[in-house]
């Protein structure tokens, strides 16, 4: 079964597969939710036929693209008229004599970061974390099976336990029988702190640290050290809630759900490609509850730490 989708602006991931769930058969597979290009793609090369998915930010993509074109290579996959960066990465991989050599070529050539999963013809999955460790890969295990993911929150309901976290630049091969290390990890780690502060799902763990625990503890410390006079703490959903709960406990004030998020119509506000639509989604998905707001001195923990769109767009409502 092969399916490639890309647009998740108006509907969620599962709905894209509702009519085809009965086609999901077999015992091995890879997939990804990408905000850059349709994935996975399938490559036929001297290394054999393989499927690949990537999480990448390639700063020098145009430079590598020009060099590959000068070597008479071509790009069959396009994303919004631009080169599909996953295909570009696959072309770097097939320059190696083995998958490991090819992935190391990616590490050398790419300025930025790139983590990936490769599904080979023999049914094994090669997992490679970017050389700086900026994006995570977590290995899970249960009886007779192994899995790799960027979000450990996907494991509990599938009965997987966290087995290990791949280190920066580490490469492993997974089968149903076990995990084989193909490349040792680098010593230097530069993981993205936004995973705990903003992007991560509350039940996920990165490098052994739980997302909700980090948010709650951050809020707790703020509450213990803040001398502001407030009646209650409120969190802008989603990531602001954990911090506000911690603040409330540290400050010794109640937590009030003064703003709720309506998600059936308005999904995540950073998903749309245009800033105008992102701003609209950010504004429309949050609904204030006046009964919990009026006459109170409120302390809000915001959810949007880049542009501050979530709380800023609701300030007028709060004052009214």
Task: Give the label of every model feature segment.
Residues 88-97, 237, 248-267:
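Amphipathic alpha-helical
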Residues 233, 240-247, 251, 255, ...:
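Extended, hydrophobic alpha-helical segments in both membrane/secreted and soluble proteins
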Residues 165-166, 249, 291-294, 319-320:
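A structural signal for short secondary-structure junctions
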Residues 80, 209, 213, 273, ...:
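Alpha-helix capping and helix-loop boundary segments enriched in small/acidic/polar residues
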Residues 54, 294, 302:
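A cytosolic small-molecule/anion-sensing beta-strand core signal
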Residues 252-298, 308-312:
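Short, glycine/charge-rich flexible loops or terminal/linker lids adjacent to PRPP-binding catalytic cores
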Residues 12, 44, 221, 242-245, ...:
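Feature captures the catalytic cores and cofactor-binding loops of soluble hydro-lyases/lyases
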Residues 1-167, 173-230, 236:
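Conserved short alpha-helical segments that host acidic/polar catalytic motifs at enzyme active sites
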């Amino acid at each position: 079964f092969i399916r490639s989708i890309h647009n998740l602006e108006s509907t969620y991931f599962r709905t894209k597969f509702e009519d085809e769930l009965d086609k999901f058969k077999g015992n091995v597979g890879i997939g990804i939710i990408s905000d850059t290009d349709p994935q996975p793609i399938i490559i036929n090369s001297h290394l054999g036929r393989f499927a690949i998915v990537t999480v990448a930010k390639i700063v020098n993509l145009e430079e590598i693209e020009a060099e590959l074109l000068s070597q008479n290579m071509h790009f069959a996959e396009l994303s919004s008229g631009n080169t599909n960066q996953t295909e570009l990465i696959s072309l770097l991989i097939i320059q190696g004599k083995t998958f490991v050599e090819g992935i190391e070529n990616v590490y050398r050539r790419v300025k930025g970061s790139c983590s990936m999963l490769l599904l080979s013809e023999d049914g094994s999955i090669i997992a490679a974390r970017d050389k700086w460790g900026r994006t995570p890969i977590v290995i899970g295990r249960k009886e007779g099976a192994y899995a790799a993911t960027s979000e450990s929150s996907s494991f509990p309901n599938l009965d997987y336990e966290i087995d290990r976290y791949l280190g920066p630049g580490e490469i492993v091969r997974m089968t149903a029988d076990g995990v084989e290390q193909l490349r040792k990890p680098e010593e230097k780690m530069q993981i993205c702190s936004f995973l705990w502060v903003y992007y991560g799902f509350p039940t996920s763990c990165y490098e052994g640290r739980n997302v909700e625990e980090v948010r709650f503890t951050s809020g707790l410390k703020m509450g213990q050290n803040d001398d502001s006079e407030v009646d209650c703490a409120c969190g802008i959903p989603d990531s602001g809630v954990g911090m506000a709960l911690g603040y409330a406990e540290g400050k010794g004030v109640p937590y009030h759900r003064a703003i709720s998020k309506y998600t059936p119509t308005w999904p995540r506000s950073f998903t749309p490609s245009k800033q105008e639509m992102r701003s609209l989604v950010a504004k429309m998905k949050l609904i204030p509850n006046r009964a919990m707001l009026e006459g109170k001195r409120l302390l809000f923990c915001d959810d949007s730490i880049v542009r501050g769109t979530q709380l800023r767009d609701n300030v007028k409502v709060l004052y009214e």
